Curated annotation (Swiss-Prot):
This is Anhydro-N-acetylmuramic acid kinase. It holds the Pfam family AnmK. CDD domains: ASKHA_NBD_ANMK. Keywords: ATP-binding, Carbohydrate metabolism, Kinase, Nucleotide-binding, Transferase. Pathway: Amino-sugar metabolism; 1,6-anhydro-N-acetylmuramate degradation; Cell wall biogenesis; peptidoglycan recycling. It comes from the Bacteria. ATP binds at residues 9-16. Belongs to the anhydro-N-acetylmuramic acid kinase family. GO terms for molecular function: ATP binding; kinase activity; phosphotransferase activity, alcohol group as acceptor. GO terms for biological process: 1,6-anhydro-N-acetyl-beta-muramic acid catabolic process; amino sugar metabolic process; peptidoglycan turnover. Its EC number is 2.7.1.170. It catalyses: 1,6-anhydro-N-acetyl-beta-muramate + ATP + H2O = N-acetyl-D-muramate 6-phosphate + ADP + H(+). The lineage of its organism: Bacteria, Bacillati, Bacillota, Bacilli, Bacillales.
Amino acid sequence: MYIAGVMSGTSLDGIDVALVRIEGSGVESKVELIHFTTVPFCNDIKSEIQQALSIENSNVQLICSLNFKLGLCFANAVKEVCKEANFSLEQLDLIGSHGQTIYHQPKQDGNRIPSTLQIGEPAVIAYETNTTVISNFRTMDMAAGGQGAPLVPYSEVILYRDPSKNRLLQNIGGISNVTVIPNQQSDQNVIAFDTGPGNMIIDEVCQRLFQLSYDQNGEIAKQGRVVDEILTYCMSHPFLKMNPPKSTGREQFGEKFASELLKRFEKHSKENILTTVTMFTANSIVHHYKKFILPYYEIDEVILGGGGSYNSTLVEMLRNGLKDENCAIFIQEDIGYSSEAKEAIAFAILANETHHCNPSNVPSATGAKQSVVLGNITFPPV
């Protein structure tokens, strides 16, 4: 089957689309990446998404309209990846669309029950592409008592499980998450959970202090030094003390967190603040390894993915934090994969599993009561 996986993450970089060919289903699936592209959001759409993400500034009319606008954006992104690949849209069998997360409530909070909302109307995508769309992957896991995240572990087992090596797959997107993949001979469980911020706070600080959307290759962070009092403040966040399975998002590490941090520590230089929040991402990852993974698993390799793997300052901080742990550290490209395409490929794989009526959540990662088939299916008009 030819499937387009569509992902718009918490970093708001744009729409990632992976065109893949998949043979079979389940752990024996054969997955081939044909082409990958990122279609940037136009400024107006990005501004509307940012407004929709803000509890103070959002409204139901905006979210209702944006749901359909994003559906059209996602459809156009699918057309673009096919055009770039010189691939006929008519040959496409399926689209797996994650959607744009507007709010994610993984745990009960007063009268707010666990819930999640991703928008990007699948009916619009199906109509515009004349292709079956599978979307809303997180909701069934949450209905089964899970946190709806992380969902990539299933695809990571298919792509990365090794005959003899125990691997950690560390994604550094807006939020960071890790998947522990024991080797094929092991009887240990696959586990996965969010480790805290990825690029989200780094990008927010960059935008506010340097008027840049991100710190390219970590060049600015390389110029500063870590401020202990800021790092201590960051590392005291309650999320770091929680036991897995757990997930987090913009609600904990987004605009509000960055605003409070910058106000509290405004006396420090811009460069030092950026260096310190970069170290916070690295330290929060290392903290979770040492507390929840390394005491129980012997890890041979750590494989980094997501946009944060291109931040050489962040990667060097991670290497230093793990230098005594006797594990090799790679980025996706080192082993023949794409850091950028990883999550879009994952949702193509999940769409394929749903098409075959296979459960594809990992209860040991999400906390769900059982394995479930993920996603809603929207058929094209004819």
